A protein has these predicted regions:
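Active-site hotspot residues in diverse enzymes, especially metal/ion-binding acidic/histidine motifs
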Residues: 1-244
Length: 244
């Protein structure tokens, strides 16, 4: 999973010390993505194969009623399903309930972690005197998560998984993340919901192409538009670089 995530960064020329650009990936991979507030669902991915060509239509839905950092993780999670998973069709990920019993869901989480927080980038940003296990300071952890635009808990887990902190040390570093951010002079926006609506790509056009090529029924075509509120939102949805 780490190699796949690193390769995607390299293909798009994103440095390991930089935050990954979700929008850059969406555009380069021709993924139609819709960001909007949802209830009970963190994200969804749909892949529809074209019959006459070795290509697919790729769709993603992300819940903006969750924290900005969670939105980025969800998007990266769905990227695994769309770009890496074999024989993939559809995935629904409920709020706070990624299916840990499913091997591909675990793979998606691991892929998302390395895409957001690459080992090489983390190690390059940590001061030399904090490279030993359990020596990293809270201020450095806060700097890392702000830099990579990820959640506090995700960063702690990643630091643990790459051997920089123990479980005991990780537990000691947990707390009210917004208070910790303020203490170190950071904005709390990373951890807050954006509740924005944004459409990346021409979803309406792609859905119509699927219908015209008999890849989906008329009922499914209108269901896609209705479920994602295309009629109501496409007139107003402007690209706001919601999740970077």
């Amino acid at each position: 999973m780490e190699q796949l995530a690193n390769q995607l960064r390299q293909d798009l020329q994103i440095r390991f010390t930089d935050p990954v650009s979700i929008h850059q990936i969406l555009r380069s991979k021709n993924i139609i993505a819709y960001f909007r507030p949802l209830e009970g669902l963190s994200g969804m991915a749909i892949k529809v194969s074209r019959l006459e060509k070795d290509t697919s239509y790729l769709f993603m839905l992300v819940n903006t009623a969750e924290g900005y950092c969670k939105q980025r993780f969800t998007a990266c999670h769905e990227l695994y399903h769309l770009l890496c998973q074999k024989d993939f069709n559809v995935s629904y990920d409920k709020v706070n309930l990624f299916d840990s019993t499913n091997a591909e869901e675990r793979n998606a989480n691991i892929f998302a972690s390395y895409l957001l927080m690459p080992t090489m980038g983390i190690r390059q940003l940590i001061p030399a005197d904090q490279q030993r296990k359990d020596s990293i300071k809270l201020g450095t952890i806060m700097m890392l998560e702000q830099n990579f635009r990820c959640s506090h808990n995700s960063m702690l887990i990643q630091l643990h998984d790459i051997g920089l902190i123990s479980q005991t040390y990780m537990d000691a570093m947990k707390g009210n993340v917004k208070n910790m951010a303020r203490e170190y002079g950071y904005s709390t926006e990373l951890y807050e919901a954006t509740n924005k609506t944004e459409l990346v790509g021409d979803y309406n056009l792609k859905a119509r192409e699927l219908f015209d090529q008999n890849l989906i029924s008329q009922a499914k075509y209108f269901s896609y538009l209705r479920d994602m509120d295309i009629y109501k939102d496409t007139q107003n949805a402007k690209e706001e670089s919601n999740i970077g």
